[in-house]
């Protein structure tokens, strides 16, 4: 019997053990070749059709559930006007930080005409550039609560106060109250003693009631301020509280705070100067922004306020895109109307969280179809069901991320980051579609190109995940969760490992995994978006770890001596 050099060097028991393993492997292959195939493998065309049907239904259901209209009781009848709404005169392409800032009188005129159909008054926050607003308010039959913006620069505050006094005295029939300062103590820009002096000065020079506006916690910290105002203006924003209230408990929280103020300041008139709910943005604990939740909160609050005879001002009239830079995406979406002055159906009528859902569904279906065409015929019978479903998941994630990016992106850097993640998902979708396809001709060449760079797509996903995880751990307040952007790459490279450089993959996996528990502690377990992100981060860390292991296996195989 001929014995190979390798067999000659091995002990007899080792050769026997190796031959036994070979025999077991051959037997397993024989059994698999003769075992009855599952029905879907015997009929790959049927499995493919089933996959197409399931994927189509899944895509349609995803976007329908996002955008279906919800019917809620209206805030008031069409002829019943509400009390007051906050108004800032900025268009969707304007910001108070633009200097020199130029107001658009025609836009302000149209804005007040629109607000006059639903409200009896508007509240403003600054006098700079708004000297003409009392005349416009008179034109449209609106009353004003005029505000002077007080900050840390005494000269700026002095100009604001002088203009406020002049406008209040020039338009006593329009200006029903004045507010000196807005959350100035919260921003720690002035002292309560300084505010007392300003309030006393304004009270001595105008006939209207004078107030100061602050979040409710700071009124309780500085109760002495109540002695210097004619009425208390408190801000009740359950979303922004240090302990946010979910939509189910928000109104109970508001009513409780309002009762506490009646007890803390007996006999003092109270205006709820700001209350509302955001329609877009990141979840804070159990407080979830959405159009439906905004409509639900506003409508229920108005009924509650009318029942109790509360004075109130809703925040705010129009969405303010410029606020996204300083308050995150959520800051720009407190309006009753959007930045284009279109009704969001917050006050009346059916309301949808995603009114454009048919457009996003069409985009997802088109991308899904393109992925199937790119992949071509499934490579194996078992892929016939998987290919349409996997492509649908990728198309849905791209669509959901696109819809989210449209909401959270305002500035160039944000759009570039969003585009980076869209491109990454498209590359991963192309990679998977081709890998599940038969792969002949140009498809085989393209798959080979993508396959050799699969580790880079994995590292690009890990880089995005690590950056976002660090942001959510160390600067989370205004950060959105990138769930739709990273779910697909994480799943693909967890199930189908890509060889990634050991050092980089290990570092990224460590950063992502190490941040999971801290961000959950910060967000608490009631935050569904945070829980989903933690799951995706775990998948992504696992994908990076598998990529690292794959690289070790490849390196070991390359260094092993030939038999």
Protein language model features and the residues they cover:
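Substrate-binding cleft of secreted/luminal carbohydrate-active enzymes
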Residues: 288-347
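N-terminal carbohydrate-binding/catalytic regions of secreted carbohydrate-active enzymes
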Residues: 87-148, 152, 156-157
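Aromatic-lined carbohydrate-recognition surfaces of secreted/lumenal glycan-active proteins
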Residues: 206-220, 268-273, 311-319
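Active-site clefts of carbohydrate-active enzymes
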Residues: 237-244, 266-294
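Aromatic- and acid-rich polysaccharide-binding/catalytic face
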Residues: 146, 176, 214-252, 277-278
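Conserved, mostly hydrophobic/aromatic
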Residues: 122, 178, 232, 272-274, ...
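Substrate-binding cleft of extracellular glycoside hydrolase catalytic domains
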Residues: 127, 133-209
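Alpha-helical transmembrane segments of integral membrane proteins
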Residues: 380-563
